[in-house]
């Protein structure tokens, strides 16, 4: 295809995104991540960040990173399967196992890479994956990369999952049930107790992505700990990029499972090892989350979430089924959602409009994410702006 044709093709596709209101506008952040930040030149309250425990700019993480960089250098110099597996990475993987309360752990460059590599590694042709309707895109892509068949069950619908297991279990060798623990657009929690019972009854492997539960629920150990089913989950997936304030993905499981993943997950085998600085920061983040200070940060996080959720509800906003610091304000209209997000930013509140295809049409929303570092005046400022422009736009 000629260069001019390529340009015209994607220019046309871009125009279509603009016309449908689906173009993703990116704002420049000019300061460290925190409850407040400088975005596009103005100071704003940040309600669009995964930085739940306010650790992303913690000086202890920065010191750990600097010390590791001085000791090991910046880059690892090789893929980790060959010569990039530094001793500090082995230390991190022991910490992952401790954090996830499993026999062993493995680190991936991103959470996306953890799902995209691990899911295909676990299944073969002749296997079946049962996946929640609202699972994260990294799970969806991991399933697509596998050779297994897939069946989608209705969101958090245990009866539908049971029906699909009953009708299909005997047709396949292995069955893998995959679910988010905390769903990223609604902030609701998967019914893991019931799902775990079904996995046991039908001899299925249970894979739980706890990206938004790590460091948030279960005294920091995540959603399975919160619900008392840690030992019922076979594969524990998580991230460092949210509550832990750093970068990377992790899997915790039995030692044999982890070693098999290490030998079969292409996103691990074919990736360059992480900078030692990132690894050291991750170790420090786990230590903080598992300390008494971490528990205090989690308590403050949930107090802020409850305050803000009740505040939005009292104004007349629909917050859906949120049970976590992810608190949607569901608008149900693309144009109004974008207008509200723009108005809030002008008022000094940084939020992001979430519209189709990220969510279904008619459920467009602003996803608010509070963190442990927000002061009450930050949340009150945001609620005041929501009230002002919610009324002005006819949303409330």
Which residue stretches match the model-derived regions?
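Conserved PLP-binding catalytic core of the aspartate aminotransferase-like
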Residues: 297-306, 313-348, 358, 362-363, ...
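N-terminal "arm"/small-domain region of PLP-dependent enzymes with the aminotransferase-like
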Residues: 6-7, 11-72, 204
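Conserved PLP-anchoring active-site segment centered on the Schiff-base-forming lysine
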Residues: 118-137
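Active-site PLP attachment segment
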Residues: 219, 225-260
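Conserved N-terminal alpha-helix of the aminotransferase class I/II PLP-enzyme fold
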Residues: 63-111
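PLP-dependent aminotransferase class I/II
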Residues: 243-312, 317-320
